[in-house]
A protein has these predicted regions:
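N-terminal binding-site loop/beta-alpha segment at the start of enzyme catalytic domains
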Residues: 1-13, 19, 53, 72-76, ...
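Lumenal/extracellular "mature" regions of secretory-pathway glycan-modifying transferases
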Residues: 2-8, 22-24, 60, 87, ...
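A short, structured active-site edge motif that brings together acidic residues
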Residues: 6-20, 58-61, 114-117
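Active-site mouth loops of central-metabolism enzymes
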Residues: 15-38, 63-68
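Short, acidic/polar
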Residues: 33-50, 70, 99-100, 133-135
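Active-site groove signature of glycoside hydrolases
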Residues: 47-67
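Beta/alpha (TIM)-barrel catalytic core signal, keyed to glycine-rich beta->alpha loops juxtaposed to Asp/Glu
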Residues: 62-231
Length: 231
């Protein structure tokens, strides 16, 4: 892309693991990755579509109804590390109980657990294994096992059940004004200052610059506490 060496681009891909029922069935409309063989097929399909020899990170998108299926899918990802086709593998949307069981049944520990996390919080859903919101137990389990906790939608953008109010929240904007910064930068710094990796993007150069500038902020303990009450 634009002459940038592949080694300077971090590529993450995800494979699905869902039975054709419940939340996943409603989204996908079909059974996916129910066996290790199917998972392997989906992995190969990803590489064909991407046209790459390797990815930097391959994630299991979410847990299945059946933990056996989650384990089978994850174990299909494990050979990617030895072959060099994935520099690391991990999971997404796994809560503490699902992650603990996975850890007890696989050979390669997930490098990362990517979950929805922001000042806004995220509406929980009654679905096996999911972490959708501020789940201290999941974060603590990740920390205890040296698994990176990563936040998607760190600005509260996509949340089950509605839109986010983060960028218009009075508390967020008050803290931003005190630091001569923006609401987005404060929201991102609230996440990263907790040692969480924030995943965000923009095609607006000024927004990208603002996001990067968030690392120059240091929020006080009282500001962190006040922002935690915004949800």
């Amino acid at each position: 892309a634009m002459g940038i060496p592949r080694s300077e681009i971090f590529v993450t891909s995800k494979i699905e693991c869902c039975p054709g029922s419940g939340f996943c069935g409603a989204v996908q409309g079909a059974a996916l990755c129910l066996t290790k063989q199917n998972a392997t097929h989906n992995i190969e399909h990803d590489f064909d579509v991407l046209g790459l020899d390797y990815v930097d990170l391959m994630l299991l998108h979410w847990p299945c109804d059946d933990m056996d299926a989650s384990v089978a899918t994850y174990k299909a990802m494990e050979p990617l590390v030895a072959s060099g086709k994935a520099k690391a593998i991990g999971v997404s949307n796994f809560n503490a109980s699902a992650l603990a069981e996975l850890l007890s049944r696989v050979d390669i520990k997930p490098a990362i657990n990517q979950c929805a996390f922001s000042i806004a919080g995220h509406t929980g859903i009654p679905y096996h294994g999911f972490n959708w919101g501020r789940d201290d137990a999941t974060r603590e389990l990740c920390e205890a096992n040296n698994i990176t906790y990563s936040a998607y939608s760190p600005l509260g953008g996509w949340a089950m059940g509605g839109t986010s109010h983060v960028l218009s929240d009075p508390t967020v904007n008050s803290v931003a004004a005190a630091h001569n910064s923006t609401a987005a930068a404060v929201a991102l710094r609230w996440v990263t200052q907790q040692g969480i990796v924030a995943v965000t993007s923009s095609d607006n150069p000024s927004h990208v610059a603002g996001d990067l500038a968030s690392f120059g902020l240091t929020l006080t303990d009282s500001e962190m506490a006040a922002l935690a009450k915004v949800a």
